Amino acid sequence: MPDAKTKTTDDKVIKSEEQWRRELSPIQYAVLREKATERPFSGEYEHDHRAGTYVCAGCGNVLFESDAKFDSGCGWPSFTQPAVESHVDEERDVSHGMIRTEVLCAKCSGHLGHVFPDGPGPTGLRYCINSAALKLEPK
């Protein structure tokens, strides 16, 4: 439940940077709010095979289901598709001398990771997501 200082407009969660800093761990804040990337093979969900739903660590928005998760060997949790297409936004990212597609939470605009066209079927996509941006709700 949002606190009194959290604004929700058109299903968007808007908080001050001070609120985000209070509510998120340092690594969650760095990833979700500052677009950082956790070190490969360091995230808690990279090798987690439990069944469940992955939600945004910032706002609880449903993002990915465990049945879409696969081991890509890249060092981050990878998914073939979002649980609900409209729950993620994509933006062109030209940082670090690369052209990539950034994946963001559609509800709080938190940085999740990137999507690449080199995944397995059925989509051929690899959503490469930072563990720090996620919380697993086990089934």
Swiss-Prot record:
EC class (word): oxidoreductase
* PROSITE patterns xref list: MSRB
| Catalytic reaction list | L-methionyl-[protein] + [thioredoxin]-disulfide + H2O = L-methionyl-(R)-S-oxide-[protein] + [thioredoxin]-dithiol
Protein's UniProt keywords contain Metal-binding: yes
Tell me, what is one Gene Ontology molecular-function annotation carried by this entry? zinc ion binding
Where is Zn(2+) bound in this sequence?
56, 59, 105, 108
Which residues, if any, are the signal sequence?
none
Residue stretches making up the MsrB domain: 17-139
Note on how the cofactor is bound: Binds 1 zinc ion per subunit. The zinc ion is important for the structural integrity of the protein.
Q: Name any cofactors this protein relies on.
A: Zn(2+)
Provide a GO biological process annotation. Answer: response to oxidative stress
EC numbers for this chain = 1.8.4.12
Keywords, in A-Z order:
Metal-binding, Oxidoreductase, Zinc
**Listed GO cellular component terms?**
cytoplasm
Matching entries from PANTHER family are given as: METHIONINE SULFOXIDE REDUCTASE (PTHR10173), METHIONINE-R-SULFOXIDE REDUCTASE B1 (PTHR10173:SF52)
Q: Which family does it belong to?
A: Belongs to the MsrB Met sulfoxide reductase family.
Q: What is this protein called?
A: Peptide methionine sulfoxide reductase MsrB
Q: Name the source organism.
A: Bradyrhizobium diazoefficiens (strain JCM 10833 / BCRC 13528 / IAM 13628 / NBRC 14792 / USDA 110)
